[in-house]
Amino acid sequence: MILELDCGNSLIKWRVIDGGGGRSVAGGLADSDEALVEQLSLRRGLPVRACRLVSVRSEQETSQLIARLERLFPVSVLVAAPGRQLAGVRNGYLDYQRLGLDRWLALVAGHHLAQKACLVIDLGTAVTSDLVAANGTHLGGYICPGMSLMRSQLRTHTRRIRYDDTEARRAMGSLHPGQATAEAVERGCLLMLRGFVREQYAMACELLGADCEIFLTGGDAELVRDELARARIIPDLVFVGLALACPIE
């Protein structure tokens, strides 16, 4: 079995897959290294024979996590690294090492699955959008704040915006003009997110052609599903790219 980890800005997503068929047998989300170790300790009975990860954290933070993983399981950890090219996709950044690794793996995975031009939108803490031509040329992309970041910035920098998570969840039941602060903020942020997604789709159709494949991934992908009815939602898209970057026999 193979342990896979996606170490993002806010959360660590992990799963254990059957090395043969790639079927997920366990998985979870952790908000800290300690929480991750606690979750994985409960699965020490699984015969994990290999581990691979992608991290957008600092080298020091990543190294510390790797050391903890190697103490927990008898494995050497493979770590995804930046590249100019992978699986037929050419990195479109002028400085290829500056493209976030999770973003790179997601767009590589999108092209690998589509085998044609594609738009990949990852809706997490930040929202990223990347366009890949049919020949594997990464045209570049965009980054904007995600729902949680927009919400937290308004709460932090606007004194009179105060509400709890329960109010936030209730507010998301409609897009009718808000009649309370939570409704106004939550619905306003969601409309901004949906507007960004619509604009990305229009640009993809212009640059890549109307038949391009659309992929949505990330924790907030379901919030914009209605905007792109033909999009494919693939929660583990980064893990698909990770397998291409760090193949294990």
UniProtKB/Swiss-Prot annotation:
Subcellular location, principal: cytoplasm
Residues recorded as binding K(+), renumbered to this chain, are: D122
Instruction: List ligand-binding residues for substrate.
Output: Y93, G100, L101, D102, R103, T181
Q: Which residues bind ATP?
A: D6, C7, G8, N9, S10, L11, I12, K13, T125
Q: Keywords, A to Z?
A: ATP-binding, Coenzyme A biosynthesis, Cytoplasm, Kinase, Metal-binding, Nucleotide-binding, Potassium, Transferase
Names of the cofactor(s):
NH4(+); K(+)
Q: Which reactions are catalysed by this chain?
A: (R)-pantothenate + ATP = (R)-4'-phosphopantothenate + ADP + H(+)
The gene designation is coaX
Q: What is its EC number?
A: 2.7.1.33
Q: Name one GO cellular component term.
A: cytoplasm
TM annotation in the entry: none
The record's family statement is: Belongs to the type III pantothenate kinase family.
Instruction: Give the protein's biological function.
Output: Catalyzes the phosphorylation of pantothenate (Pan), the first step in CoA biosynthesis.
Subunit structure comment from the entry: Homodimer.
> Annotated pathway, please?
Cofactor biosynthesis; coenzyme A biosynthesis; CoA from (R)-pantothenate: step 1/5
What protein name does the entry list? Type III pantothenate kinase
